[in-house]
Amino acid sequence: MIASHMIACLFTELNQNQVQKVDQYLYHMRLSDETLLEISRRFRKEMEKGLGATTHPTAAVKMLPTFVRSTPDGTEHGEFLALDLGGTNFRVLRVRVTDNGLQRVEMENQIYAIPEDIMRGSGTQLFDHIAECLANFMDKLQIKEKKLPLGFTFSFPCHQTKLDESFLVSWTKGFKSSGVEGRDVVDLIRKAIQRRGDFDIDIVAVVNDTVGTMMTCGYDDQNCEIGLIVGTGSNACYMEEMRHIDMVEGDEGRMCINMEWGAFGDDGTLNDIRTEFDREIDMGSLNPGKQLFEKMISGMYMGELVRLILVKMAKAELLFQGKLSPELLTTGSFETKDVSDIEDDKDGIQKAYQILVRLGLSPLQEDCVATHRICQIVSTRSASLCAATLAAVLWRIKENKGEERLRSTIGVDGSVYKKHPHFAKRLHKAVRRLVPDCDVRFLRSEDGSGKGAAMVTAVAYRLADQHRARQKTLESLKLSHEQLLEVKRRMKVEMEQGLSKETHEAAPVKMLPTYVCATPDGTEKGDFLALDLGGTNFRVLLVRVRNGKRRGVEMHNKIYSIPQEVMHGTGEELFDHIVQCIADFLEYMGMKGVSLPLGFTFSFPCQQNSLDQSILLKWTKGFKASGCEGEDVVTLLKEAIRRREEFDLDVVAVVNDTVGTMMTCGYEDPHCEVGLIVGTGSNACYMEEMRNVELVDGEEGRMCVNMEWGAFGDNGCLDDLRTVFDVAVDELSLNPGKQRFEKMISGMYLGEIVRNILIDFTKRGLLFRGRISERLKTRGIFETKFLSQIESDCLALLQVRAILRHLGLESTCDDSIIVKEVCTVVARRAAQLCGAGMAAVVDKIRENRGLDNLKVTVGVDGTLYKLHPHFAKVMHETVRDLAPKCDVSFLESEDGSGKGAALITAVACRIREAGQR
């Protein structure tokens, strides 16, 4: 009767007054969103302190690395054992995880007691007891003969140094086993098992209960990257970027951080938020001054907080008509379970009455209403404080990922969260208010931390298996010193074949004479025109070469486009268009009608018969002008100049871009006798002794040989080094079977090799969770510029993920690490192969000259060499390693092949003038 009467009167004016009275009295416990955001800001600062190497020792929030580097992706499978030790009872579990299209977890477990004499005895006794219980469990399941992986949940303060190494800092929860503090608990279990000798296990991971919660929920929801426990105690963990964890080496990937957030405020950070009741609870606790945040929010203290408030308000004659009872004055008499019961929507007021009577009080209706309101304020503050710190964690993850809107899941366990009727809802609402730009899902952990320990173990096993499978594949792309020496030897053989008259025709490496017989000596001078034609745009340049004190090169140039109808029209139309552009340039430079020597960079396959005669073998790069193939391009140009009858030009030299690069660098460095291009394509040239150039008469002097080394291997001599990925790229190219070396080293193909490897990994479930997107199937999406960006040292994995997202590939942090590794392996092999080819060239020059040591410079151009962050360094190291008797310098060409054509012309004019004198 009294209960129904109380419920009916709940909202009477009297009750409202009582609620207002409590609200006024507990004003400092009711936290505004503004205050919560300030607490959140402070907590973010504390997190940073805990992560920093210099600030960590004094940080209150310790931010401990757990060495758990990945959350479940749903493909885990296998049979695992788990030990869950955190109190007077401990559990042993067998966890079977299956992945046959349907994720399923089966668990069997048994609870074992730890007698008090063992808890307080020696460490040897304790771990022998644990090993005995483990043996008993395995006997029952008849699995003793199996060596199963085991995960160990050990919920005591530990210093963790590896996933399977954790040193106990101090016992808590009534444990006093001697000889354990300061020791590695994994080692102690292993030794106890060895002492028995009747079974063996593989201890893979030791974790705390918070990490176990995150991993348990992470199996069901792959967005889960935060673990939260609000029970007797409180703690949280989350996945942090490795680059921010100063205590652990390495910058790539993520690691779970055990925050130990209960200690937030131990340094005084929360003094203005803590109330007199919080201070009283702390003073009466077993660890005064420690775990101050935990004492404001966790189940161990919530009931006691309510009791202290009731006592204080009764003393102030605001409750119970100023009367107290011995029971109410007894510490611990008001439990957190009582708070949950009183806040129950259905019969909370009735429960308040019963609990207050149990405490020896004679409560009036308004006393019950006031007690209900006190419980509400205390539990709401707890949820709000939790929300403030969670908001800081979510904000940090969002910042780490650089996302405008974060989608994340929080795995939660603990009696307060699960059993209090309103705590969870209040927590959820507060989090969403404090971080409105985060879509947060809360997922209850139903299977406790034992399953979590098994999940950590399952993930570690999956990662190890996948790593082994990937490494086996990537091994085929990693070249040993011996293999690279063999590539160098084979290149030298192919060079000899190309130089010899007898074998030249069948040789893939053509070693074409360029009729360039000297490099610049610095005495060149004069004004020269240069044409640079190699694509849909071409350049006309005026190059002024000065010698003496004013030695240098001054350049003016203009870029002209070639319309598609001209590219596909007649040869006459094409060369008339080129001459029209030259005329325009001369007029633009105020040099109309002037006759100048001209150098012509013509980057199409040609057979050169003299410095100023080059027969076009075939058009490439989209050109189809009729009447040109099989013709001398210099003659075609001269005929077009004659047709115009406006000016005359002395076409002195026609060269390709590689020779142009060598000559450009040769002007800066007289030791430059080799040219190399590693860009979209790849080629090399060098100064060969005339006696070895059998295709050209004469024994004296030297001539630059255009190697056309991209075709190295077209005769099958590299087949043992080519992988299935190289073969796939070749077969789908425009010229299958041709330019095989180029397809292993040049920018046009490296991205395709990477894409093929990524497809292979994804099909085998080693990447992108086994899901192949349509975008990944698209040829050419993986441009080489992305390789350069992905491998950039200053680029965080976050930016790597952004690049992959731009390519339409949704990746996890682990995926990004794998993609980066594939890019590294492919680019490194390219640089090493390039270095092996270059080592063959410089060693040949040294041997030609009969020198013990050669000092030589290589002029280099090309986007891959210039823009890739590591290509040049790896190539240089390889050349040094494979050609130790050569002192090789590398000089980047800054002005392209047009300047090179002008310098060849300048050298030819110098030699011609010297001959005339």
Swiss-Prot record:
Catalyzed reaction equations: a D-hexose + ATP = a D-hexose 6-phosphate + ADP + H(+); D-fructose + ATP = D-fructose 6-phosphate + ADP + H(+); D-glucose + ATP = D-glucose 6-phosphate + ADP + H(+)
Record flagged with keyword Transport: no
Sequence segments annotated as region (Hexokinase large subdomain 1): 208-447
Annotated positions binding D-glucose 1: S155, F156, T172, K173, N208, D209, N235, E260, Q291, L292, F293, E294
Residue ranges of the region described as Hexokinase small subdomain 2: 521-655
Tissue distribution: Predominantly expressed in skeletal muscle, heart and adipose tissues.
Residues covered by the Hexokinase domain: 16-458, 464-906
GO BP terms in the entry: apoptotic mitochondrial changes; canonical glycolysis; carbohydrate phosphorylation; cellular response to leukemia inhibitory factor; establishment of protein localization to mitochondrion; fructose 6-phosphate metabolic process; glucose 6-phosphate metabolic process; glucose metabolic process
InterPro entries assigned: ATPase_NBD, Hexokinase, Hexokinase_BS, Hexokinase_C, Hexokinase_N
Ranges for region Mitochondrial-binding peptide (MBP): 1-16
UniProt entry keywords in alphabetical sequence: Acetylation, Allosteric enzyme, ATP-binding, Cytoplasm, Glycolysis, Kinase, Membrane, Mitochondrion, Mitochondrion outer membrane, Nucleotide-binding, Repeat, Transferase
Residues binding ATP 2: 532-537, 680, 747-748, 784-788, 863-867
UniProt function note: Catalyzes the phosphorylation of hexose, such as D-glucose and D-fructose, to hexose 6-phosphate (D-glucose 6-phosphate and D-fructose 6-phosphate, respectively). Mediates the initial step of glycolysis by catalyzing phosphorylation of D-glucose to D-glucose 6-phosphate. Plays a key role in maintaining the integrity of the outer mitochondrial membrane by preventing the release of apoptogenic molecules from the intermembrane space and subsequent apoptosis.
Descriptive protein name: Hexokinase-2
Organism: Mus musculus
Protein's gene: Hk2
